[in-house]
């Protein structure tokens, strides 16, 4: 067995990851070590796009989740870092298959955007600043806790009723 790319990154830098023989193409095709379901970004992407095409899931959560990780990856590691964070670990699996769970994700479009951004933010905070190299599952769980509050905020915003008139006013 060998270290996973995120494990190597947690103890070094992007140079260490690429010096250990991991290439972006290896990450994309799944020619690296890792847990089942997190190694082939290509296979997960095909499966996720199929679910979107069949309208089983909405694209809002996966797109905002992955885009948030990409933007924060640009900030903390440049373009190579952004691609690495998207292709390594369980991000693609979490974005397409876990975060889109009907029961634990928001129902309204604005809520889905907030949920996806929150998942991406927590994922990157855990990956960059915590001692645990993978943060996707924890990020999704944290956002699942916040889902009722996100739904409540978005529901009030979307279905806002007009203010009641004061007595004597029409």
Locate predicted features.
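Loop-to-transmembrane alpha-helix initiation sites
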Residues: 62, 83-91, 111-115, 131-143
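Hydrophobic core segments of alpha-helical transmembrane domains in multi-pass membrane transport
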Residues: 43-52, 65-74, 93-98, 119-127, ...
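Membrane-helix interface "capping/anchor" motifs
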Residues: 52-63, 102-113
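Cytosolic-side transmembrane-helix boundaries in multi-pass membrane proteins
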Residues: 106, 126-170
């Amino acid at each position: 067995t060998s270290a996973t790319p995120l494990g190597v990154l947690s103890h070094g830098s992007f140079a260490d990851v690429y010096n250990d023989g991991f290439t972006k193409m290896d990450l994309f095709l799944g020619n690296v070590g890792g847990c089942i379901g997190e190694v082939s970004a290509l296979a997960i992407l095909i499966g996720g796009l199929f679910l979107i095409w069949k309208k089983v899931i909405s694209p809002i959560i996966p797109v905002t989740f992955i885009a948030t990780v990409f933007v924060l990856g640009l900030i903390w590691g440049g373009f190579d870092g952004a691609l690495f964070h998207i292709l390594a670990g369980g991000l693609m699996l979490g974005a397409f298959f876990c975060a889109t769970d009907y029961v634990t994700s928001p129902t309204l479009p604005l809520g889905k955007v907030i949920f996806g951004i929150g998942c991406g933010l927590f994922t990157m905070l855990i990956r960059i600043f915590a001692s645990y190299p993978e943060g996707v599952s924890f990020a999704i769980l944290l956002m699942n806790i916040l889902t009722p509050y996100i739904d409540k905020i978005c529901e009030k915003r979307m279905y806002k009723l007009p203010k009641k008139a004061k007595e004597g006013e029409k």
